[in-house]
Curated annotation (Swiss-Prot):
Pfam families: Kazal_1. Residues 4-54 form the Kazal-like domain. Keywords: Disulfide bond, Glycoprotein, Protease inhibitor, Repeat, Secreted, Serine protease inhibitor. This is Ovomucoid. The lineage of its organism: Eukaryota, Metazoa, Chordata, Craniata, Vertebrata. The record marks L16, D17 as: Reactive bond 3. One of its GO terms (cellular component) is extracellular region. It comes from Haemorhous mexicanus (House finch). GO terms for molecular function: serine-type endopeptidase inhibitor activity. It comes from the Eukaryota. PANTHER family: OVOMUCOID-LIKE-RELATED, SERINE PEPTIDASE INHIBITOR, KAZAL TYPE 2, TANDEM DUPLICATE 1-RELATED. It is found in: Secreted. Gene3D superfamilies: 3.30.60.30. Avian ovomucoid consists of three homologous, tandem Kazal family inhibitory domains. PROSITE patterns: KAZAL_1, KAZAL_2.
Amino acid sequence: IVAVDCSDYPKPVCSLDYMPLCGSDNTTYNNKCIFCNAVVDSNGTITLSHFGKC
């Protein structure tokens, strides 16, 4: 199981780093911060599918 620790999120501003992650909603998130903010916004319904683009 792949997992990302989102305990420090949400954050008001994300960097522009490009290290894509694929969410369980089949959306490619550009980096961990953007992904974790989406996870928090979704109340945990979005999870990490895999690292890299969907």
